[in-house]
Amino acid sequence: MQTSDTRALPLLCARSVYKQYSGVNVLKGIDFTLHQGEVHALLGGNGAGKSTLMKIIAGITPADSGTLEIGGNNYARLTPVHAHQLGIYLVPQEPLLFPSLSIKENILFGLAKKQLSMQKMKNLLAALGCQFDLHSLAGSLDVADRQMVEILRGLMRDSRILILDEPTASLTPAETERLFTRLQELLATGVGIVFISHKLPEIRQIADRISVMRDGTIALSGKTSELSTDDIIQAITPVVREKSLSASQKLWLELPGNRPQHAAGTPVLTLENLTGEGFRNVSLTLNAGEILGLAGLVGAGRTELAETLYGLRTLRGGRIMLNGNEINKLSTGERLLRGLVYLPEDRQSSGLNLDASLAWNVCALTHNLRGFWAKTAKDNATLERYRRALNIKFNQPEQAARTLSGGNQQKILIAKCLEASPQVLIVDEPTRGVDVSARNDIYQLLRSIAAQNVAVLLISSDLEEIELMADRVYVMHQGEIAHSALTGRDINVETIMRVAFGDSQRQEASC
C-alpha cells in the first residue's frame, strides 16, 4: 500500500473516457487515476464497464473519446504493444498462456532481445518467492500459478502499471495472503496496481483507494479508510432493477427433459478408492438432493478429480459408480447422456465457445440430441428462459459469448450445464469473478437444483461459500480426502482450513 503522500504525479490518469457498443453507452465520461506505490481497487456489478475501461487502458480496445495521460504525455488511444512500452500490463482473470510451451518460454515470449535476461527472471522469481520448474509445461499449472506467470510476464517488461482482474477468485485465504505479500513487495518499488475484485474484505486489506463503477459511470470514489461498506454496496447496487420472474419461479426453475427421479438421500454417485493424476484413494458418496462441498488448497487435486469423473483425464485405479453402474470406461459423451454434467473452472478455454452465439452456447450440450443443426427459435426461447432466471444481461441471442462481461459469461455456462438435465452436477468455482448480486442468484439456483433432487458436487476455494452452501464437506489435502465428511457445526471456515493444511500442520506452500 502507498506509504507516502508525496507521490503527487499519477502513473496513469484517464479523463472523460467514453465508449459505445452497438448503440449502447458502456462508458460515460470516466475519470480514473493511479499513483506510484498504490493499489486502486475497482468494483462494480457485472456489465458496469470495468473490463472495458481496463481494455482501453491496456490498448486492447480504443475509446470513442477521452484521453490517457501516462508519464506526463497524453494519448487518445493505445495499442497493446504501445501500452507495454509505456509500462502497462493487464493480467486477465483467465490467464492467457501457451499450454504447450514451458513456463520459461511463456514468461519470455514476445520480449525484445534487450529484455531477455535470465538473471532478471531469476531475481524476480526469488523476490516473489516462486519455486517454479521453469522447464515444466504451462498447461500443467493450476489457475493460481498461471496468474503468477502472467504477473512475471508483466514484470519482465518493466511494467509500472499492473492491472489485476480478479486475481484471488480461485485462491484460498492462505494463497491470497501469499499473493498480497508479493504485491506489497512490488508496491515498494513504485509499481501501481489496479485491483479488480468483488471481495470487500480483501479490498479493505490491500487497497489505498476504491472506485465503484455502475452503469458506465464512477458512482463512488475515495480513500478506503473513508468509505463504509454500506456506502460501497449502495454504490454497486443498480438504482432500478429489471423486473424478473417471481421469487418462486426463479427459485424453482424446472430442469428440462425427462430426467430419472431419485428420492432425496439416495446415493447417486459413489467413488471407490479412486486414483488418478493429482489424487489417490478417494472414496466418497454423493446423494440426491444434497450439495456436497469439496474444499482444499489450490493444487490439492480437486479439479483433477472432477475432470477424471467427467472422463477428461485417465483413471488409474478404483471405480466410479453412477446410479449403481460402473462408468469407468465410458466416454465423456456417454457420461453426459447418463446425467453426469461438469461446469469447469476455466470458462473461457474449457466451458464456452467464445465466438459462437449465446443461444448456441446454452444449448451446446443438447444439440446432438435434437440434431446438430439446432432450431434457432427453440434455442432463443431456451436462452430467454435462463436470461430471466439468472438475470443474464445481453443485447441479442446472436451476439458472441466473448462480448459479455465475465459474470454474465459464467451465467451462460451455468445455463448450458442445466439445459443438459443433470442427475449429478459438478460445479468447479461456480461464482469465480461474479459480483455479489449475481453470486446470490447462483446460490439460489444451486439450491433450487438440489431441491429437485439433483446431486450437486460444489468445488470452491471460497470457504465462506462452502460454509454457506454445503450440506456436507470433504476436504482434500495433497491429493487425498483428509478427513471424514464434515457436517453440521463442523462446517466452518476454521475447521476446513485446519483440515486443508493437514490438521495442525500449517506448512508454507511454494508459489
From Swiss-Prot:
ABC transporter domain boundaries: 12-240, 240-503
Membrane topology summary: Peripheral membrane protein
Family: Belongs to the ABC transporter superfamily. AI-2 autoinducer porter (TC 3.A.1.2.8) family.
Enzymatic reactions: ATP + H2O + (2R,4S)-2-methyl-2,3,3,4-tetrahydroxytetrahydrofuran-[AI-2-binding protein]Side 1 = ADP + phosphate + (2R,4S)-2-methyl-2,3,3,4-tetrahydroxytetrahydrofuranSide 2 + [AI-2-binding protein]Side 1
Family matches, as CDD domains: ABC_Carb_Monos_I, ABC_Carb_Monos_II
Function as written in the Swiss-Prot or TrEMBL entry: Part of the ABC transporter complex LsrABCD involved in autoinducer 2 (AI-2) import. Responsible for energy coupling to the transport system.
EC annotation from Swiss-Prot or TrEMBL: 7.6.2.13
Keyword Signal: no
Keyword Repeat in annotation: yes
PANTHER family: AUTOINDUCER 2 IMPORT ATP-BINDING PROTEIN LSRA, CARBOHYDRATE TRANSPORT ATP-BINDING PROTEIN MG119-RELATED
Keywords annotated in UniProt: ATP-binding, Cell inner membrane, Cell membrane, Membrane, Nucleotide-binding, Repeat, Translocase, Transport
The protein's assembly and partners: The complex is composed of two ATP-binding proteins (LsrA), two transmembrane proteins (LsrC and LsrD) and a solute-binding protein (LsrB).
Protein name: Autoinducer 2 import ATP-binding protein LsrA
GO molecular function: ATP binding; ATP hydrolysis activity
NCBIfam families in UniProt: PRK15439.1
Compartment(s) where it occurs, according to its Swiss-Prot or TrEMBL record: Cell inner membrane
Gene Ontology CC, one term: plasma membrane
Residues annotated to bind ATP: 44-51
